[in-house]
Amino acid sequence: MSEAKRLAAEKAIDYVEDGMIVGVGTGSTVAYFIDALGRIGHRIKGAVSSSEQSTARLRQHGIEVLDLNHTGNLSLYVDGADECDPNRCLIKGGGAALTREKIIAEASERFICIVDPSKQVPVLGKFPLPVEVIPMARSLVARQILALTGGQPVWRDGVVTDNGNVVLDVHHLQVTDPVGLERSLNQIPGVVCVGLFARRPADVVIVGGEPPQVI
């Protein structure tokens, strides 16, 4: 699937315009996008990064990494996904960067999601849904998620987010109402962010292939 990821990432470069500040996500597909962005780095003003991992890769390419507090809203955000449904709703957060990813998506006029074909699903939920949680609330949130959804929350032991929080991965879900589930989980005290991108889905999904498919 690495070639499909690369093809999707290369296609996303078509959306980058001269003078832009580009929002950049996290993950294996985004790594290909950063490499492609490095070839045109002289044409853009810089990037806003969703993770320390992406920040390091951007800087390796000589791309200036900027603070979202100073840039204001962005024209473009490019990121991957763990799952994508036909309505461009996403599950994200396998790399534990979901909160910063959601912040940048919210601040961006256009959100381009780049995936390989294996990430396309008819209904979200086969991939465990990540939920970022304040550490002291981990058990409370897990109990409430179980009661609310019937899904099985599993603590991602040993993982600490860039924000200093922990992640619960909720298994065995069928997300037939992504917007409703995102809203409900966000109401649980201690939840920082839910890895459902439904209220703010992708505007465009690029599926890697020969040629790439644009949805």
Swiss-Prot record:
PANTHER family noted in UniProt: RIBOSE-5-PHOSPHATE ISOMERASE
Gene: rpiA
Active site residues per record: E101 (proton acceptor)
One GO molecular-function entry: ribose-5-phosphate isomerase activity
Origin organism lineage: Bacteria, Pseudomonadati, Pseudomonadota, Gammaproteobacteria, Lysobacterales
An annotated GO cellular component: cytosol
Disulphide bonds in the chain: none
Chain residues that bind substrate: T26, G27, S28, T29, D79, G80, A81, D82, K92, G93, G94, G95, K119
Function statement: Catalyzes the reversible conversion of ribose-5-phosphate to ribulose 5-phosphate.
Assigned EC number: 5.3.1.6
Quaternary data: Homodimer.
Family: Belongs to the ribose 5-phosphate isomerase family.
UniProt record, GO biological process: D-ribose metabolic process; pentose-phosphate shunt, non-oxidative branch
Protein name per its UniProtKB record: Ribose-5-phosphate isomerase A
Reaction(s) catalysed by this chain's protein: aldehydo-D-ribose 5-phosphate = D-ribulose 5-phosphate
Keywords carried by this UniProt record: Isomerase
Pathway connected to this protein: Carbohydrate degradation; pentose phosphate pathway; D-ribose 5-phosphate from D-ribulose 5-phosphate (non-oxidative stage): step 1/1
